[in-house]
Amino acid sequence: MPNPIYLAELNEADYPRVREKDPTLPETHRAWLRGADERVQILRGRGKNPVRYPIRFRAFAERNDVLGIPSFDQAARDDYADEQGRAHTAAL
């Protein structure tokens, strides 16, 4: 199973390192990264730490109109990210 990808990791500077963790992720898509950055700013504006938010790939793709990215079609990745996020939050 792939490692969870957290929202704060989705920026142009960190994305190559993120793809090393999960090579099934698509190459950089600027609209996707821009959407991730907007979400990070919203969370920070609410006083939240975006490092604690794993991506639910399908929902994120739908909100950002990037459904053409094949790797976002995997429900198992959504479920895994949710499980990892809950485990991470519970450990805090």
What are these regions (language model features)?
Residues 1-92:
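N-terminal low-complexity, charged segments
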